[in-house]
């Protein structure tokens, strides 16, 4: 899992201006590796001088700048009415893993044969699949004024109990999707300060797995 998360770009931040006059600034994002998901909360400079102004927040302009990267399934311009975007965990909708289907319930670890009816076997496998399944739970998160759209639907692995029987293993992220947002970026000081919107990538957990 470490290689997956390290390969994902964390979102932020910085760099580099370059060539020519202030009207010709070019910004390039330098991604930082993420050691884990979900992305931890970003500690921002509280100085309002680093905030976008009202004229910098035109929805029409920013939608055009973000283009096809805008994904209403994972981002929202306005505060969503329902912050919890996931229903309570239920029976998985994905196909049951092959290793569960092939599980032999007619023999104990000590070699003793037991009789298990088809209905009982099906019920037990469904229970085991439900118990060991690791759903992704989504909630809306406010990234703040310096991101646009400022609301992101962030995924978390179910963590209220162990996912193994006996206990000991837990749900951990194994896959993520990357969404592109706009980040308000400023450089320079005083009269030399220049601010603009740049595109940054934000990884979101898309699949979890029961793991050590």
Curated annotation (Swiss-Prot):
One of its GO terms (cellular component) is extracellular space. Residues 47-56 have a biased composition (Basic and acidic residues). Glycans are attached at residue 84. The keyword Signal applies. Residues 1-23 form the signal peptide. Keywords: Chondrogenesis, Developmental protein, Differentiation, Disulfide bond, Glycoprotein, Secreted, Signal. Residues 37-56 are annotated as: Disordered. The keyword Disulfide bond applies. Its main location: secreted. It is found in: Secreted. GO terms for biological process: cartilage development; dorsal/ventral pattern formation; negative regulation of BMP signaling pathway; negative regulation of cell differentiation; osteoblast differentiation. It holds the Pfam family Noggin. It comes from the Eukaryota. Homodimer; disulfide-linked. Inhibitor of bone morphogenetic proteins (BMP) signaling. Belongs to the noggin family. This is Noggin-2.
